[in-house]
């Protein structure tokens, strides 16, 4: 006799994806946090499709857990794909200021676009996930 397949996992994921999609419609900037030890495995394969052209800042945390050579290789890999990244170690506070500055720059860019279209600047709505 075979064991029955677990059915709660796909439904759980589908529900979370629907909720995320609703939240993404309301934000200007998505700050995605990934693990430096496995940066590809800690990203969602459908995130680019969900972003629909929104500004995206990738924060790679736990930079202290990888060698400088590995960090440089990953940085080059992401840069080659047009993805801006900020490396940090949230536990030690290293790189957190750079994350803040990158988010502020993204907000400035958003408000510049709003001004060019005759709209007033407003606070940036950001979503952090990962």
Ranges and model annotations:
Residues 34, 60-61:
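Active-site flanking residues adjacent to catalytic metal/cofactor-binding acidic residues
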Residues 57, 63-129:
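Canonical P-loop GTPase G-domain recognition
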